[in-house]
Amino acid sequence: MINYLKGKILFSNSEYISVVVNNVGYKVEIVAGRIYNKGDEIDIYIFTHVREDSFRLFGFDSQNELNLFEKLLSVSGVGPKSALALL
């Protein structure tokens, strides 16, 4: 699983960023309201969410933020989208 990425931001909007690492682009869903600029170098902690029909990456600025996200996921009825919105 992907746990951490270090690369350059290729694209950014309010829902996700594209991070290029060794010429491979990763779409990473982010906390709403975060501002990232194209061309900036980024270190981002990743939660990898795998299901039968999808493979999604969620990105966080710190290990503590990632840990909080994982704790929110342990609450019954809270999925990745809800947990991300709560942050």
Predicted regions and their residues:
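Long, highly charged, low-complexity intrinsically disordered interaction regions
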Residues: 2-6, 10-87
